[in-house]
């Protein structure tokens, strides 16, 4: 074990020594590289330093040479010979400047003369072109076929313009009729609207009256119901009181019946006793025979004895008074019972009458409610129909008012676009310069008059175009009724152009067409002619520019 450990420690020491050697070699390499770099940098620094020093030496030498030259030049300048030469040069320069000013004045005067000559040349060329145009016109005027063709073309154009004018007039009259119809319809709708408003107000009033009546009927019903409830309560109280009184009376009646039965029993007993007494008296009378009036007295005595037996204290007066009092009480009770029976019958009749009245009131209330409901339903149906009609008429009125407003705005725009004079309308009282229902006809009349004038101007312009362009070119006129006329440009100012002679292609095309042309074909032909003219103008401009360049070159050479 010890040997193995020694071998391992020796191996580790060898490895550490090798690693140290490698590290030392690497550090040595790095140091050598750094040394080389420092040597190279030193060499380069020395080389640059030497170059800088050499450049500075060269600059010093050049500066010395320049200093020598400047000193020599200063010495030469200050010499009297050079001073004389400078004086001579100064005098020559002054003379040359004076001559330059004279020549410039001559050049400006010559330019003015050349401009005048150019103007004269332009005027002469214009005269030549006018003479040529007059010559061509005379030739064309003397040509009968050309004249017939021009007449045919002008007639076709006039026919188209008149047809267009007639269509515009018919459309204008139709629009005027439509506006009048719309105004009448508006007035009728306004009248109907006012009537419907009145009917609606009356319906609302009747509805309010019906509502008030129904409210009053409801209040009366509530009052009647309250009365009925009070009467029912009163009836129940009366019935309860009546029942109590009946019970009391029945109790009294039972008591009286018991008393009567008792009295009847007593009376029956008494009558039996009296019958027995009468029988005994009869027997005695039979026994005694015929006796006088004294025997009746004995009977009275017997009766008197019986009455004394019946009396409590032997007082017959008290007995009679008690009997009479009892009879009076019985009679009073009998009368009271009869009165109560009569009152019961009257109360029954009253309750029956009240019940009949309640039934009648309920039936009347039900019928009145049904009537008011039916009336309210009818009124609601009428109100719904009237509101629907009013809504329909209101929508129609809004549509008509929108169309009228659109027509008014279009008329006002057309009036302003064609520059119509509104002094006649504005001179009237209450006019504010806006198109209204009242002054619409007047605006139409002014627009119609202006369209007639514009069509006359258009026909005159077309006649002038057919005859040929004059010297004084008129102002451009834009026809509002033709779409192609807006594409035509106004005539440009005349420039000096090389004369180019050629036939008019547009007139030749019109001559080739035998039938009258419509608006679309005319517009197409005008556009083609316009494009062709633009091309020819561009060619003429290029040629004129070339001619101007040649003239300038000639002038410069001259």
Curated annotation (Swiss-Prot):
Tissue spec. comment: Expressed in testis, brain, thymus and lung.
UniProt KW Coiled coil keyword: yes
Keywords in alphabetical order: Coiled coil, Differentiation, Spermatogenesis
Highest taxon above the source species: Eukaryota
Record Pfam families: ODAD1_CC (PF21773)
GO terms, biological process: spermatid development
Effect of disrupting the coding gene: Male mice are infertile despite regular copulation. Display shortened sperm tails and malformed sperm heads and motionless spermatozoa. The 9+2 structure of the axoneme seems to be intact. Spermatozoa are able to activate oocytes when used in intracytoplasmic sperm injection (ICSI) and these embryos are able to develop to term.
Parts forming coiled coils: 10-44, 185-259, 369-414
PANTHER family (UniProt xref): COILED-COIL DOMAIN-CONTAINING PROTEIN 63
Chain's role: Plays a role in spermiogenesis. Involved in the elongation of flagella and the formation of sperm heads.
Name recorded for this polypeptide: Coiled-coil domain-containing protein 63
The encoding gene: Ccdc63
């Amino acid at each position: 074990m010890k040997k193995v450990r020694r071998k391992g420690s020796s191996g580790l020491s060898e490895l550490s020594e090798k690693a140290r050697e490698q590290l030392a070699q690497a550090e040595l390499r790095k140091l050598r590289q750094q040394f080389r770099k420092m040597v190279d940098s030193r060499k380069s620094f020395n080389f640059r330093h030497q170059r800088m020093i050499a450049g500075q030496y060269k600059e010093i030498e050049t500066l010395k040479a320049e200093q020598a030259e400047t000193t020599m030049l200063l010495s030469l300048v200050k010499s009297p010979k050079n001073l004389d030469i400078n004086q001579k040069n100064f005098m020559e320069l002054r003379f040359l400047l004076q001559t330059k000013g004279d020549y410039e004045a001559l050049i400006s005067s010559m330019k003015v003369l050349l401009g005048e000559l150019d103007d004269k040349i332009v005027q002469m060329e214009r005269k030549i072109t006018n003479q040529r145009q007059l010559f061509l016109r005379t030739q064309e005027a003397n040509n009968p076929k050309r004249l017939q063709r021009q007449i045919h073309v002008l007639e076709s154009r006039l026919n188209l313009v008149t047809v267009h004018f007639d269509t515009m007039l018919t459309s204008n009259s139709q629009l005027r009729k439509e506006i009048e119809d719309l105004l009448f319809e508006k007035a009728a709708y306004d009248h109907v609207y006012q009537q419907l408003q009145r009917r609606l107000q009356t319906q609302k009033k009747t509805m309010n009256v019906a509502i008030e009546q129904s409210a009053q009927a409801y209040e009366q019903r509530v009052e009647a119901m309250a009365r009925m409830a009070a009467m029912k309560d009163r009836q129940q109280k009366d019935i309860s009181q009546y029942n109590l009184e009946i019970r009391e009376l029945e109790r009294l009646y039972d008591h009286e019946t018991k008393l009567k039965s008792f009295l009847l029993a007593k009376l029956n007993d008494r009558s039996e006793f009296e019958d027995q007494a009468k029988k005994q008296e009869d027997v005695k009378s039979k026994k005694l025979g015929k006796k006088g009036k004294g025997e009746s007295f004995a009977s009275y005595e017997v009766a008197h004895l019986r009455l004394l037996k019946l009396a409590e204290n032997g007082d017959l007066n008290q007995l009679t008074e008690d009997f009479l009092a009892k009879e009076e009480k019985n009679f009073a009770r009998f009368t009271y019972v009869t009165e109560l029976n009569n009152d019961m019958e009257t109360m029954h009749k009253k309750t029956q009458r009240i019940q009949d009245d309640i039934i009648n009131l309920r039936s009347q209330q039900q019928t009145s409610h049904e009537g008011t409901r039916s009336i309210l339903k009818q009124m609601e149906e009428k109100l719904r129909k009237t509101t629907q009609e009013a809504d329909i008429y209101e929508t129609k009125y809004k549509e008509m008012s929108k169309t009228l407003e659109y027509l008014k705005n279009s008329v006002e725009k057309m009036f302003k676009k064609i520059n119509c004079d509104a002094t006649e309308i504005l001179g009237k009282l209450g006019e504010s310069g806006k198109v209204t229902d009242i002054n619409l006809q007047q605006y139409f009349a002014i627009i119609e008059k202006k369209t007639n004038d514009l069509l006359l101007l258009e026909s005159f312009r077309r006649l002038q175009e057919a005859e040929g362009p004059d010297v004084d070119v008129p102002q451009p006129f834009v026809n509002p009724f033709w779409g192609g006329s807006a594409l035509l440009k106004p005539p440009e100012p005349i420039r000096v152009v090389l004369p180019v002679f050629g036939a008019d292609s547009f007139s030749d095309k019109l001559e080739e067409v035998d039938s009258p042309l419509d608006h679309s074909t005319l517009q197409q032909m005008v556009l083609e002619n316009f494009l062709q003219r633009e091309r020819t103008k561009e060619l003429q401009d290029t040629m004129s520019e070339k001619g101007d360049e040649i003239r300038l070159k000639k002038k410069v050479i001259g």
